[in-house]
Every structure is written in structure tokens, then in C-alpha cells.
A protein has these predicted regions:
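N-terminal helical cap/lid subdomain that shapes the substrate entry/recognition surface
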Residues: 1-91
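Asp-based, Mg2+/Mn2+-dependent phosphohydrolase catalytic module
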Residues: 1-2, 90, 94-97, 101-215
Length: 215
């Protein structure tokens, strides 16, 4: 049975939307101007930035007395509370599994935080397994993390697909591992010339349909 490798944040769950929701509420609570949302989004860098950097940036910009540790926890809790599993995404995962695919999440991040996302949203019920960078000591785009995912699933990378939104981590990593890929464009244009996705889709449901139809 072929592997279906999946990114987590902004692929299976809308991490960007959850962060925006928290950020708007937080900025409103401290009386910051609405246009500061753009600054905060740039610091977060679509989740690629460190939560500690976001916390320190907020403390410095607004002279907040709250400790960095407490602010980091507030940010993480605020995002977690807003994450939801779209029922249509759950349905698409179930269809892919029924079609013979083995869904495995491959994600960069802290083990506790990423596992909490999987369990609190209910995604864990639709996956064969998951691989988290902190746990295995290697991050996307290193192809080793994809090999670990195959080992976890007792499968092979031959015939596998990777679905994700990050050009470097997901698509670059898949290319290095010799795996076909679907890039979730999210309204963006592909810019990288060294490698490219096998397919492009607007969202994860369309991406999963592409993978299922490829057999």
C-alpha cells in the first residue's frame, strides 16, 4: 500500500487562520492599532518563525510586563484553541485510506505541541502514524525524515506522494527523497527553479483527490 505523506500546519489544519484569529484578539486587548497585524504576521513568518521571537517582539514593541514564557504559552494556547479539523478534510482522508493509501503526517516542530494538535483536532484517528522532527532529530527538507516515515509505516518511499504547503520543507524535501508531490499554493505562485511539485492544488481536498486519482 503506497504512502500518503502529509504536512500538518496549513495543510491538514489552518494554522495561519488560527494565528490571525489569536493575533487580532490579542492586539485588540492591548489597544494596538489594527495595522500592526501585518507586522505581527511578518514576525510569525507563517509559522516558520520561533514563538519565542514572536513573544519577545511583542514585549519589546509594546513594553509588555508579562514574561516571555507566559506569552509563549498564551500564543500557543490561543492557536491551539482555534484549530479545527474540517469535516471535509477528514472525509477526504478516509476516502484516501479506503482507496489503499497509508496516511502519515511528517511535520517540523516540537513533539508535545504537534501531537496535541493531532489529538485535539481528532486528526490522529485518520492517520496510520506521524513523524515529528523534534522526536526523530531531523527536519524537513532533509530526506531522512521521509525515510523514517516509511519505516514507521512499514512501507517504502517508492510510489509515495507528499502533500504540503511549504516550497522548501515539503516540496524540496520530497524532491530530495525522490517522492512525487502536490504543492498547496494558497494563492501563491511557484518561484523555486531548482525543483518543483508534480502537481499543484488550491487546497488539501483537491490535493488528496489528485493523489487518489494517480493510481
Amino acid at each position: 500500500m503506497p504512502l500518503l505523506l502529509l504536512s500538518l500546519d496549513d495543510t491538514l489544519v489552518d494554522r495561519a487562520g488560527a494565528f490571525v484569529g489569536w493575533a487580532r484578539e490579542f492586539l485588540g486587548q492591548i489597544g494596538a492599532p489594527e495595522y500592526d497585524l501585518d507586522w505581527l504576521l511578518s514576525v510569525d513568518a507563517d509559522g516558520m518563525g520561533s514563538t519565542w521571537d514572536v513573544a519577545e517582539g511583542l514585549r519589546d514593541r509594546y513594553g509588555l510586563i508579562v514574561s516571555a514564557l507566559d506569552l509563549v504559552e498564551e500564543i500557543r494556547d490561543g492557536i491551539m484553541d482555534r484549530l479545527r479539523l474540517d469535516p471535509l478534510v477528514a472525509c477526504a482522508l478516509a476516502i484516501a485510506e479506503d482507496a489503499g493509501w497509508v496516511p502519515v503526517v511528517v511535520t517540523n516542530g516540537e513533539t508535545h505541541q504537534q501531537e496535541e494538535k493531532l489529538r485535539r483536532t481528532g486528526l490522529d484517528r485518520y492517520l496510520a502514524d506521524w513523524v515529528i522532527s523534534e522526536e526523530v532529530g531531523v527536519r524537513k527538507p532533509n530526506p531522512r525524515i521521509f525515510a523514517i516515515a516509511a519505516e514507521r509505516a512499514r512501507s517504502r518511499l517508492a510510489g509515495a506522494w507528499m502533500v504540503g504547503d511549504s516550497p522548501e520543507a515539503d516540496i524540496g524535501g520530497a524532491s530530495a527523497a525522490g517522492v512525487r508531490s502536490v504543492w498547496l499554493s494558497r494563492g501563491r505562485t511557484w518561484q523555486e527553479y531548482r525543483y518543483g511539485p508534480t502537481r499543484t492544488a488550491d487546497g488539501v481536498i483537491a490535493a488528496l483527490a489528485e493523489v487518489v486519482a494517480s493510481r
